[in-house]
């Protein structure tokens, strides 16, 4: 694309990267200023792989992360990797790795906090520690955007769960997008945790409050 993603011309040299690993999918690509290279983080079975490129066409494998960290169950997918400032600690930043996966109670998004040097992601968390991005059951496949006003990191997820996604009654769709969220990092009890609040632009959607008095739900309610 030469017009900031508004139109695309298919590249004749596709695919630019292949693998014999299972579930090799969901690439997230961003530019890493410190190394001057493009970084691709991509799901590969029960882990995430990191590749780098100078031109977006020729890719070099850099590292693999995840086999011995966090929760495992279904395939790891929908990776993301980004840098965030630490709230209340001027000049301090950390990198966050997002990972969506299916576990016993359905689909969830876990995250890891650490450092990234352009080749390796090094988590601060213990290998057996699991940090969930959301404790609700309907927030999955989260992706983030950079370039938002004021340097904010905006996240958007799929409001559904693979445990029942194919059985949710609907008309022409399965689930919907979540509200955009602004992400941050806050130290709580010495531990860095991911924070999220609705993006400030969502306030434009607010209207007058509407209250429904208490009532019993009967079988005829649909």
What would you call each of these model-derived segments?
Residues 31-36, 83-91, 148-151:
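Residue-level detector of Asp-centered blade-edge/turn motifs that repeat once per structural unit
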Residues 47-49, 110:
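A short loop-to-beta-strand structural motif that recurs across blades of beta-propeller domains
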Residues 1-2, 50-56:
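Conserved Ser/Thr-centered positions that define the repeating blades of beta-propeller domains
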Residues 46-47, 102-105, 162-163:
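Short glycine/acidic-enriched loop and turn motifs that connect beta-strands
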Residues 38-42, 95-97, 155:
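Hydrophobic beta-strand segments that make up the repeating blades of beta-propeller
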Residues 87-113:
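Loop/turn-rich, solvent-exposed surfaces of beta-rich toroidal or solenoidal domains
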Residues 5-31, 42, 60-83, 120-142, ...:
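Surface loop/turn signatures of beta-propeller and other carbohydrate-active proteins
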Residues 90, 110-222:
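Beta-rich accessory regions
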């Amino acid at each position: 694309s030469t017009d900031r993603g508004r139109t695309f011309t298919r590249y004749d040299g596709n695919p630019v990267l292949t693998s014999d690993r299972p579930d090799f999918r969901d690439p997230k690509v961003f530019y890493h200023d410190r190394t001057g290279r493009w970084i691709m983080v991509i799901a590969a079975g029960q882990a995430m792989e990191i590749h780098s490129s100078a031109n977006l066409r020729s890719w070099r494998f850099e590292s693999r992360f995840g086999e011995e960290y966090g929760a495992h169950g279904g395939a790891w997918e929908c990776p993301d990797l980004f840098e965030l400032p630490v709230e209340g600690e001027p000049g301090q930043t950390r990198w966050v790795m997002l990972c969506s996966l299916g576990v016993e109670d359905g689909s969830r998004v876990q995250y890891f906090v650490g450092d990234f040097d352009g080749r390796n992601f090094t988590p601060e968390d213990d290998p057996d520690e699991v940090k969930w991005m959301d404790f609700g059951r309907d927030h999955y496949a989260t992706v983030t955007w950079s370039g938002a006003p004021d340097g904010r990191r905006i996240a958007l997820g799929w409001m559904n769960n693979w445990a029942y996604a194919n059985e949710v009654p609907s008309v022409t769709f399965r689930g919907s997008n979540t509200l955009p969220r602004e992400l941050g990092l806050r130290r709580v009890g010495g531990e860095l945790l991911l924070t999220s609040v609705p993006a400030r632009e969502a306030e434009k959607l607010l209207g007058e409050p509407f209250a429904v008095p208490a009532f019993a739900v009967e079988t005829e309610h649909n």
